[in-house]
């Protein structure tokens, strides 16, 4: 196995998170590519794990803290580590040490870039990005938000612990129309799928929807709202991990529209 950096030849695999086979991925639009074009000169780092057959099986992406969902100084933040585990497409690459190798490479790279530590998030439920896995790699919890844990590995005594950015205000319920508010960053295709489906669903109700879209690549938007990736329908946050189906989103909006009359 080897760890390679992103190249122009592997960009398309990166944009779809190694899931070229996925029908759902078609709903993601070009949000990830736009985010990449914006971030590629702002400290974004991407690495791939490649097996002995020269097949890409996993990836890691990490950014400076000031371009992430956390508050921190002189830190890099892992947005995600993803080792392809589906039978479809390229197949299952789990349990081969790719995740550990990717994380180690990111730590070494972050040190060389002068960062004081590497930060990540983890979930306390047994799914993607498990907090328990990061704990075994030497990461410690420094903040909590629901089922999410903010974890880090400081590299020196000068490192200051990070914390989650928390909402400073929330979208309000609509008055004469249903309010649909989207906070979109673009780094995650799963979130982008949810955003694109929500926009399509909102368009099904002309004259009934007040659609607001905020680009959270802008740090000013993040500092104003304290929100990075979310969808609100009439002031209520909906779950977008994993991305809900178009039908489910449309049903939520239709229910609110019905109450207008």
Predicted regions and their residues:
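Conserved beta-strand in the GNAT
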Residues: 48, 55-66, 77, 82
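Conserved catalytic-core motifs of GNAT/GCN5-like acyltransferases
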Residues: 121-122, 138-152
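Short amphipathic alpha-helix that is part of the acyltransferase structural core
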Residues: 1-51, 55, 188-190, 197-200
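Conserved acetyl-CoA binding element of GNAT-fold acetyltransferases
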Residues: 71-93
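Non-catalytic, surface beta->alpha helical segment in thiol-disulfide oxidoreductase systems
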Residues: 235-261
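Local sequence-structure signature of Cys/Sec-based thiol-disulfide redox active-site neighborhoods
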Residues: 167-204
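Conserved GNAT acetyl-CoA-binding A-motif
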Residues: 108-124
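Conserved acetyl-CoA-binding loop-helix of GNAT-fold acetyltransferases
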Residues: 90-108
